[in-house]
From Swiss-Prot:
One of its GO terms (molecular function) is DNA binding. One of its GO terms (cellular component) is excinuclease repair complex. Gene3D superfamilies: 5' to 3' exonuclease, C-terminal subdomain, GIY-YIG endonuclease, UVR domain, UvrC, RNAse H endonuclease domain. The gene is uvrC. Interacts with UvrB in an incision complex. The lineage of its organism: Bacteria, Pseudomonadati, Pseudomonadota, Gammaproteobacteria, Alteromonadales. It holds the Pfam family UvrC_RNaseH. This is UvrABC system protein C. It is found in: Cytoplasm. Residues 16-94 form the GIY-YIG domain.
Length: 610
């Protein structure tokens, strides 16, 4: 324990009321947040003579001072603890790292509602279906629904500017309410059916469609009856693919596996008896943390997340029991003001779902451990190859991508000892340089990256430059200038492609000394350096292609006199893209708001070379 902190004196003044405590280190950083029913009793436990837990020993050794906040109840303490953990992200707390809001499908409240991907606050009027486990699940569902129900998915501006059906109508994926091809009643009918389908009422949807098909057949509307028949067939095919149980309610099923410092919470979202989706969480767990704390911390943070409170089911099945589960359940139930039950002893369908969740969690941890061991070995061998005295915690790699100097983009990718850390990836749009000047592009990218760096920031141990010695020199000059007050400035290494740009013939040069070094091409250290180089190249070229395409979509129109930003936007949105604009007749161009006959002729001639 640091001599600057007097635990005995501190504990004399601590109350026995419920509350939250924040532990700070000498740098005034919050390193741990905890809650207690009895603050004095809980805080005293940290300063006993014999502390067996290694994590607690490490925590106590770094305490500089402790702040205490008294609350009215244990529930209030739980809520405040959750807020503080999200605010400070303390290093000794179990942290739910993926705290993004869940994605939903929005069925808007317009006269002709649209289906859309939604993430974030629910401000727009309409019905929200979800939550879905990830964005991919939403997009997959939207793609499926588009095949089953011809409801628009375009944005409102595009919808309002249409004068003719778009491609989605030709593909039978939209009934074109924008131009009145479908009646309001027919469109509303499909919207209601889509809503029922999204609520999991497949049988009800099919039943209604069967009735409509039979009515259409009786009325000798055979084409309409055939449309209903095809819709029913597609729906039945989808329904057969979904796993269904005899349990018809909503619940979350959580399988937990914890080994070698890696914890996985695999969640199955059961809605109306079906597996609606699944998602794995890997909370950041400090070394030597007990499983009870991992469970309690995760559940508290997860179910008190404001983004998902309104969609929490009443029943949550958990693979592990732990001390304090009853109190945690009561606190969450009180905080949410709704019935909430944590169960660990289940049978039948619930047990089957739980076994599935546990299997997925176990497999996920095994995969993570295997990957972690492989990455760790690569880092250790790279440290040996570079003869480093300190372990590598963070590596970055920069690359430049352009086409003949057009749409230049720089990338910065980040690796830590778990592999690629994509949350820290960055792209830089390079401006104000001569096209094709890779040195100036690298200078701008490195300058922007290191502009605000300090000892408390994310200082890389290694920086790789994908390029030649000239780019390395530019980067080294900038780093020397920007990192003058940094205790341990990064080591720069450039990766230069070999003869014929063949993989395995790369050369590596150290910044400053400009000495080259060799690593066997079959060495894991070599593979690690090429991995980060290739990832940087991939990230740069993807950004460059996106920027180039966006530029080319507008640059053709930019060259036409009289076509400013507003007219370009109107043309692209009204007609659906640059190719459609190029293929439009003069008459079609005049239907775009703001385009006169004379302007339409000018645009037509410019794009057709006439």
């Amino acid at each position: 324990m640091p001599s600057g902190f007097n635990a005995k004196s501190f504990l004399k003044n601590v109350t026995s009321a419920p509350g939250v405590y924040r532990m700070y280190d000498k740098h005034q950083q919050v390193i741990y947040v905890g809650k207690a029913k009895d603050l004095k009793k809980r805080l005293s436990s940290y300063f006993r003579v014999n502390i067996a837990n290694v994590k607690t020993q490490a925590l106590v050794s770094h305490i500089d001072h402790i702040d205490v906040t008294v609350t009215h109840s244990e529930t209030d303490a739980l809520l405040l603890e959750n807020d503080y953990i999200k605010q400070y992200m303390p290093k000794y707390n179990v942290l739910l790292r993926d705290d993004k809001s869940y994605p939903y499908i929005l069925l808007s409240g317009h006269k002709h509602p649209r289906l859309a991907y939604h993430r974030g606050p629910k401000r727009e009027k309409g019905h929200y279906f979800g939550p879905y486990p990830n964005g991919g699940a939403v997009r997959e569902s939207l793609h499926l629904i588009q095949k089953l129900f011809p409801i628009r998915q375009c944005d409102d501006l595009y919808y309002k500017s249409r004068s003719r059906p778009c491609l989605q109508y030709q593909l039978d994926r939209c009934s074109a309410p924008c131009v009145g091809i479908v009646s309001d009643d027919e469109y509303s009918e499909q919207v209601k059916l889509a809503g029922l389908f999204l609520r999991g009422k497949d049988k009800q949807v099919i039943s209604q469609l069967v009735a409509k098909m039979e009515t259409a057949a009786i009325d000798m509307e055979y084409e309409r009856a055939a449309q209903y028949r095809d819709q029913i067939t597609a729906l039945r095919r989808v329904a057969e693919q979904q796993e269904v149980s005899n349990h018809k309610g909503d619940m979350d099923v959580i399988g937990v596996d914890y080994a070698s410092g890696i914890a996985c919470f695999h969640l199955l979202f059961i809605r109306d008896g079906k597996i609606f989706g699944s998602r794995s969480y890997y909370p950041s767990v400090p070394a030597e943390t007990e499983i009870e704390e991992v469970l309690s911390s995760f559940l508290g943070q997860f179910y008190l997340n404001a983004d998902i409170q309104r969609t929490i089911p009443k029943e949550v099945i958990l693979s592990h029991h732990f001390d304090g589960i009853t109190e945690l359940q009561a606190s969450i139930e009180h905080a949410l003001d709704k019935k909430f039950e944590l169960k660990t002893q289940v049978r039948g369908d619930r047990a089957n779902f739980l076994r599935l969740a546990m299997t997925n969690a176990s497999n996920a941890v095994a995969t993570k451990l295997s990957h972690k061991n492989t990455v760790e070995q690569r880092f250790q061998l790279l440290e040996e190859a570079l003869e480093l005295n300190e372990p590598i915690k963070r590596m970055e790699c920069f690359d430049i991508s352009h086409t003949m100097g057009e749409s230049t983009v720089a990338s910065c990718v980040v690796f830590n000892r778990e592999g690629p850390h994509k949350a820290d990836y960055r792209r830089y749009n390079i401006t104000g340089i001569t096209g094709g000047d890779d040195y100036a592009a690298m200078e701008q990218a490195i300058s922007r990256r290191f502009d605000k760096i300090d000892n408390n920031g994310k200082v890389p141990d290694l920086v790789f430059i994908d390029g030649g010695i000239g780019q390395l020199r530019v980067a080294q000059t900038i780093v020397d200038e920007k990192c003058v007050n940094i205790d341990h400035p990064p080591l720069l290494i450039c990766v230069t492609k070999g003869e014929g740009r063949k993989a395995g013939l790369e050369t590596f040069t150290v910044g400053g000394s400009e000495q080259t070094f060799e690593v066997a091409s079959d060495s894991p250290a070599f593979h690690l350096m090429l991995h980060i180089r290739d990832e940087s190249h991939r990230f740069a070229i993807t950004g460059h292609r996106n920027k180039r395409q966006k530029t080319r979509n507008t640059s053709t129109l930019e060259s036409i006199a009289g076509v400013g930003p507003k007219r370009r936007k109107a043309l692209l949105q009204h007609l659906g893209g640059i190719q459609e604009v190029k293929g439009a007749s003069v008459a079609e161009l005049t239907k775009v708001p703001g385009i006169s006959l004379e302007m339409a002729q000018t645009i037509h001639d410019a794009l057709r070379g006439g």
